[in-house]
Amino acid sequence: NVIGKIANGIADDMLTTTLNLWSLVPTVLGIVFLAGPSLKFFGKKKSVYVGAGGQILGYAIRGLAAVTMNVPMLIVGTVIGGLSTGPLSVPVNVLASDAVDYGEYLTNKRIEGTGTAVVSFAQKLSTGLASGCVGWILGLTGFIANEAQSAATKNGIVFMFAWLPVILLVLVIIGYTFIYKYDKEEEEVLAELQKRKDAVK
């Protein structure tokens, strides 16, 4: 994987396992212990900003670490990125539920299956694009397996490892700012839906 390629350029194969551990543990901790307080204190929209901002910082530090071959800095960036996963991913994952609620509010029809299908499609599409992007960038930079890599290939790997995620996260923040307005209407929507349910009883 990309972490492995960076790690092998910095030290050895053992560092790959270390980095994976430093990524996994903070990610779990971020989801379990930081997501809830972040949602409660900031709300869904601002929690996304907090998580995305933390991940941008983490990826930027990892990018600088990869360029300077600084292992402690690489670990710090990995930990920051992992801890930021919870505040970012949890509110994003409830967007489908918000869409279902808002759809019911507008149409008086609750179509949960469509929301699930859209999320599933988006996940598969993003996975495919991510895999394709790795192949495209490695191909364009002249990557050759099991051989010493050129400076262009190394720069391409660092770009995928750090700077491309930063760009995508900035786009997420921009898109979320202009598209997601549900937070302003959520209380009204939920109150109306509850009112309709009570009227049926």
Regions found by a protein language model. Give the residues of each.
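Membrane-embedded alpha-helical bundles of multi-pass transporters/translocases
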Residues: 1-201
